[in-house]
Amino acid sequence: MRTSSKRLHRFNPGHEAAVGIGQANYTPDAASRRMADDLETLPLWYADSGDSVWITHTEGADQFLDSLPLFLRPDVRLLAADALCRLSADVEGPLLATPWGLSPDVLAAFERLRRRGAPILVPAWSDALRTLTHRQTAARCLERVLRRLPELQPIAVPRFCASVGEVVDYVTTCQAPFILKTPFSCSGRGILTLENASITDPERRWIEGALRRWGVVSIEPKLDKTADFALEFHSDGHGCVTYAGLSVFDTHPRGAFTGARLGDPNRLRGQLSDILRGPLFDRLRTAVTDTLCDTVGRIYSGFLGVDMLVYRRLDGSAAVHPFIELNLRYTMGLVAVELSRRVVHPDAIGRLLIARCPAPGDALRAHQADSRRFPARFADGRLRAGYLSLVPVTPASLFRAFIEVV
């Protein structure tokens, strides 16, 4: 997928809040910590051959790898901190610290590991990365993409409000419904929907709390969404941004990721609206690539995704929002792209699913039931049909990541 350096991956979901706080000793919220624990082996499926994954819980990891067919088993090592500290730099060469998302806290964790003797190269944190992660960057990118694609329907660029009064002014002069977002958030977090121009007391308290913590909130009209999709990219940090693939995905009503489609890229493109099956798709890809080259190409090095959507206009016609969100990190969409390329049979279609269970034990029971109900079938070294877990599932697990292929 990328460069000559071997990498040490680490799964740290929800890193945007850590970027916003900007502290090396930041502690993620409980849900992010639990997801990081339960899905920590997920980088197996997008890491390159010879890479390693830094895991905390070794119990079950080796058994999970042993349970995979040899032809499907990634050539990637799962290593705990003690094992990493025993590696020899002379033999191994330094491993480049590569978290799911760059943030001061995860880089500080890598640095502590390096000081214990692990042969790791830790990139430096830059305040410029914080600026790029702020939603204002996505808003500026939206403006640039719209200028490059005049054939798109006009889209309201998010407005950033520093007071409740500014929010009230916006909702009383524009047409409801609206979406408010905190500046450092993703995947349905930090989002409030206003169904009308009359702000309720709970909504006002949410806005006041967000303003106290972040200083601003963004607001924009809520569109009548009919489909989510994303374009995935890689930036080399020297001004070159390249297209990495298409992701078609599903979300909860509040925007949280639930699953992504798997299969041949041309077949996935065929699932999009008719307006994206012609030349507009290629023009959109080019416009976004050029915008990213100008905006992030010389500052950020790594994978990134741009969330987009198809929506229904008042006259019933379909239109495209070309730049909902900028994700400066690995994404579930990129995981889906790699699973389609490496794991799923080219003649099959399926879904990557992320599920959260209410209590310990529920995830294991669901995993066992799915394994019995949809046994995996393989052809030509690929998953042709059935269920495949992407991570170990233990009695303590709450989160699952898995594939269902038909």
Predicted feature residues:
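ATP-grasp fold ATP-binding core
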Residues: V171-T193, R212-K225, E325
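Glycine-rich phosphate-binding loop of ATP-grasp-fold ATP-dependent ligases
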Residues: P158, P177-E203, A230, P253-L272
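Conserved N-proximal alpha/beta basic substrate-recognition cap immediately N-terminal to
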Residues: S32-L42, W54-D169
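N-terminal-proximal low-complexity accessory segments that begin disordered
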Residues: R2-S52
